[in-house]
Amino acid sequence: MPYSYTEKKRIRKSFAKREDVQNVPFLLATQLQSYLTFLQADTATSDRVNEGLQAAFSSIFPIVSHNGMARLEFVSYALGEPVFDVKECQQRGLTYASPLRAKVRLVLLDREVSKPTIKEVKEQEVYMGEIPLMTGTGSFVINGTERVIVSQLHRSPGVFFEHDRGKTHSSGKLLFSARVIPYRGSWLDFEFDPKDVLFFRVDRRRKMPVTILLKAIGMTPESILAHFFDFDNFELKSEGGMMEFVAERWKGEMARFDIADRDGKVIVEKDKRINAKHLRDLAAGGIQRVSVPEDFLYGRVLAKNIVDPDTGEVVAHANDEITESVLNAMRAANVRDIQTLYTNDLDRGPYISQTLRADETADQMAARVAIYRMMRPGEPPAEEAVEALFQRLFYSEETYDLSRVGRMKVNSRLGRGDDSTGPMTLTNEDILETIKVLVELRNGRGQIDDIDHLGNRRVRCVGELAENQFRAGLVRVERAVKERLGQAETENLMPHDLINSKPISAAIKEFFGSSQLSQFMDQTNPLSEITHKRRVSALGPGGLTRERAGFEVRDVHPTHYGRVCPIETPEGPNIGLINSMALYARLNEYGFLETPYRKIIDGKVSDQIDYLSAIEESHYVIAQANAALDDEGRFVDDLVACREAGETMLTAPGNVHYMDVAPSQIVSVAASLIPFLEHDDANRALMGANMQRQAVPCLRPEKPLVGTGVERTVAVDSGTTVQALRGGVVDHVDADRVVIRVNDEENVAGEVGVDIYNLIKYTRSNQNTNINQRPIVARGDKVAKGDVLADGASTDLGELALGQNMLIAFMPWNGYNFEDSILISERVVADDRYTSIHIEELTVVARDTKLGPEEITRDISNLAETQLNRLDDSGIVYIGAEVSADDVLVGKVTPKGETQLTPEEKLLRAIFGEKASDVKDTSLRVSSGMTGTVIDVQVFTREGIVRDKRAQSIIDDELRRYRQDLNDQLRIVENDQFDRIEKMLVGKAVNGGPRKLAKGATLTKAYLADLDRWQWFDIRLADEQHAVVLEQAKESLEQKRHQFDLAFEEKRKKLTQGDELPPGVLKMIKVYLAVKRRLQPGDKMAGRHGNKGVVSRITPVEDMPHMADGTPADIVLNPLGVPSRMNVGQVLEVHLGWAAKGVGYRIADMLRDERTAQAKSVRGYLEKVYNTTGSSAHIDSLTDEEVLELANNLKKGVPFATPVFDGATEEEIGKMLELAYPDDVAARMRLTASRSQAWLYDGRTGEQFERPVTIGYMHYLKLHHLVDDKMHARSTGPYSLVTQQPLGGKAQFGGQRFGEMEVWALEAYGASYTLQEMLTVKSDDITGRTKVYENIVKGDHVIDAGMPESFNVLVKEIRSLALDMDLERN
């Protein structure tokens, strides 16, 4: 496989034992695909499938008026272009959305004629609100902030059977139940009670006997019994009777009388149990019927009504028990043949028969009335209402929808195959068969369903969730339209008069803005972004709640294999409810998670890949990815470890159907980034996966020396890097953009052959981290499509780089690494290894108040000039100013109206428009504990308000930059185009041209160079074809110029029009501060194996433990953090990192030697490193220059990839260490024989430590829990309104709570005065605290404690209970 432009620069040596059969799929595909299907914006109207918006419209329309004389039909919809692009929406605080317009048709019918005919048709486009658009990276911009819609894992629609696990009844009896869950509509439950009567309930209301439902769907007691039971046939005799003999029904029964054959020979004696031999003898005797005594008939249940053949009178009813009197009545009526229900205690229970007895309804109508009374208690059951309600419950498409998934699940569970054909509502057959399966379960046949099986839980993606919301909005519109349609004819209304888009906009806005599944995007680093978009949550509307979710739902299920990650889930109350999709997982058409497998054909593992859902997978035997194969792809071992239906087993190779695609397929993106994951305890791996998402991007990202090979995929798919859309040559590079001249073969004729990539510079992310892109190509580089052109935050040469590679020593150091603390060398801080830039956005708004408008100004009274010296004339801070806490960023004054004005003064003020003389200073200041540099200022002004100088200059700058951009583009485009034209023209014959060019002359470069390039188009070529091409080129250039002018005008219009601001706001100013955060004690750091800790001390370099050659350790970790936590992966990472660095040193040594033999010796060494073990790298495909560039990039260490579950073995690490540290080097550095430990020296004393220390390189991260954000102190500040106690928390600038336990402590010490001070003047004694402040100012430290306000609150509370409480001084 050829290396891409960036991969060539630094090849990652992989230890994988097997080739990748399938690449990791695009990681954001689920989100993007789902929303694309929802919108279908680029699909022609006729080609749109019935999904998303199309489905929502077609399910609601046509809307018919109540009298049926008018209807509103849906024709098509179209999405307009969004007004602002993503970046502009983020700056202005707007939603990135496009307007939705639907073409609808109003049809009015003529009521005069016998059959209605169409009288009039009006068609019109109607605005239906704005639909938010997804950005290219799968997020939405809502009100200026990026949000993600998380997919929801919910219970699939369908029919489910379960039991209560014996918890309901004290006897521990299993009570079976069934539930039919539609996509929308009423739930239908069936359940047994402890007495084995079967009930049903609708929407969890009160239960009723199930036979009421069966009668309501039109069955009679006879047909119900016939459906659920087999019958025994009897012929009545004057005494006893004859019974039809069915052998299998007698097996295991007690004989209640002697059973004889035809000859009278007794085969089974009375009170003996009938066994198989008896049955064989009876069959041999040819017995068809058996004579039974009278009492054998007693207690049996009649299957049909018994009618007197002469009079037609009913002698006995179906489901009646046979008693002596019933028998006599039947004999009296000359009834010969009767049928009874066949039941037994073992596997044919009389449940439906018992239920019929409990049911008091007589016929279909009575049953439906009973259901109506349950659903609508207290309403009189009119016949039409009863019918309508019953139809709407399960049979109306408007109110009940199983959905395709539901229909498929119902069909497959009731044994009708796996297709989704059939109506989307319930049918009578569905109800009957569900009850039948439930009765069979109670009889001991069949299996209950596992609701945590991923075949019974499906994923609702963005598109589907948005569609449901849109539909809800349309339903509200439908009601309003129905009412107005009646008046449509009389008032001559048009479609747009009928449809109000407000409900739709409101529903969409509510969903994207405040739904539980619409979340503020986690944007700390690229990994957290990508993980957030691949998240699957069981919470949210229609899902579970934290409190009600039990252990089973949260647990790892065998079907999670390859679909949902068993490792990555939050710690805390949401554990197991929020999951991450596995690396290769995708959704199928029904929304079930699928995972890929390699098919095995004729015992050979093929490269054919099939995606299987959890249901399909249960039918196959699947081998693991690490099963040993020979060269032909056959299994080597006689027994192969496999999975079948969730169980692990060993089986012969012949029985295996599929094989895993890759060992990493069971884990998620974050977990697949942990090297040596297989050596870590699961709990720690979970922490490691979660903490990588909190890593703060460092100023200079550094690739991990030990990675897993997924780093490149994550960096590229996350969208933080810039990828080439087409191949070509880099024409121009600077910090802001990369310009690429596209290859001729990739360029479409007539299009611009230039791609310009504008880079994102110092932009704030949602978590205030810094997003900044840096170009990694140089002018003249050849790049191919998909190559990385620029690195983003936390990426290094197109690979994810969350932290830094640190030299780690595992040893205790004077207690400074007690309990996971981390000791760090000062050199790390000095080299800015963990320095990060954070961007804070501070906003100030000038509003229109009752007393006059607030004003942004530099003219603020009571402020010294030193405090204003960073503001310009408009009162806004300069870009580049360095500011610290309490500095003024934007000067603002607000009118304050303490003085009551007389009416005359008010009038004068109103006439002369003089604003109130009293103003208070409400300027925007830097909040406490923050220092930084102003990097950007944005001023937004309401339409109709005059812009200040600063706002105008910002707009001018923006326009100038844009114009320059366009001019550059134009220049490049024109140069490119003219180059192509020149190539075409040189050497061609002409018919004539400028400067008296003769006919038949041949064009030369010199002649063309002499002309102005636009004059080239005046040349008349002899060849007709080339002349056409020349004309086309001219047209395309002119068109391009025109396009650019239009684009500039558009931009200017956008910038100069007033900004949309919230009501009452005149101006809004945003100031962006860049804050540099260096590593300091109190910051949280972690490795990738869940080994987290807090920096305890930053030690001078000279005091750190160092090696024999003087290299000091960067970080000293406590070795006691490893054994009990069982995350040994970190130790292996340290060893392999040590080898990686050592190999880098060896390469650096070679490069220092003579120039001539360099490439050859380096190539030889690289071959050894890359191709001794693991998967091989193609070093031979590189040129000498490329080899040397590669070697130069490898000087700081060769990056290794050790894929999850397929990584480097101990032996391979050993080999690498030997390559990296030959004997002479090892001796010089005083390494142990294994090269994995070294003798270290104490930096303070110079003495050698008493035993060797494990030392090596680990990729260590700085997490987003920075001490600067947590550190907080307060002297005076805001107080709570009612209790007058200080507020709590840093955000409110609150105090530290002196709680109940702290009071106990002071009481225990008897420190009464301290206690009094804490509970009064330092808290809520208002007069007392004022006095103390005055006393301190005077220098007189006296405390005068009074009554705490909270005590007064208590007194008030007691008074509100009508108890008067007075305090008397004694």
Curated annotation (Swiss-Prot):
Keyword check for Oxidoreductase: no
Record GO biological process: DNA-templated transcription
Database matches in Gene3D superfamilies: 2.40.50.100, 2.40.50.150, 3.90.1100.10, DNA-directed RNA polymerase, beta subunit, external 1 domain (2.30.150.10), DNA-directed RNA polymerase, subunit 2, domain 6 (2.40.270.10), RNA polymerase alpha subunit dimerisation domain (3.90.1800.10), RNA polymerase Rpb2, domain 2 (3.90.1110.10)
E.C. designation(s): 2.7.7.6
Molecular function as annotated in GO: DNA binding; DNA-directed RNA polymerase activity; ribonucleoside binding
GO CC, any one term: DNA-directed RNA polymerase complex
Keywords of the record: DNA-directed RNA polymerase, Nucleotidyltransferase, Transcription, Transferase
SUPFAM superfamilies registered for this protein in UniProt: beta and beta-prime subunits of DNA dependent RNA-polymerase
Catalytic activity: RNA(n) + a ribonucleoside 5'-triphosphate = RNA(n+1) + diphosphate
InterPro entries to which the protein is assigned, alphabetical: DNA-dir_RNA_pol_bsu_ext_1_sf, DNA-dir_RNA_pol_bsu_external_1, DNA-dir_RNA_pol_su2, DNA-dir_RNAP_su2_dom, DNA-dir_RNAP_su2_hyb_sf, RNA_pol_bsu_bac, RNA_pol_bsu_CS, RNA_pol_bsu_protrusion
Nucleotidyltransferase keyword on record: yes
Subunit details: The RNAP catalytic core consists of 2 alpha, 1 beta, 1 beta' and 1 omega subunit. When a sigma factor is associated with the core the holoenzyme is formed, which can initiate transcription.
Similarity field: Belongs to the RNA polymerase beta chain family.
Function as written in the Swiss-Prot or TrEMBL entry: DNA-dependent RNA polymerase catalyzes the transcription of DNA into RNA using the four ribonucleoside triphosphates as substrates.
Protein's recorded name: DNA-directed RNA polymerase subunit beta
Organism whose genome encodes this protein: Bordetella parapertussis (strain 12822 / ATCC BAA-587 / NCTC 13253)
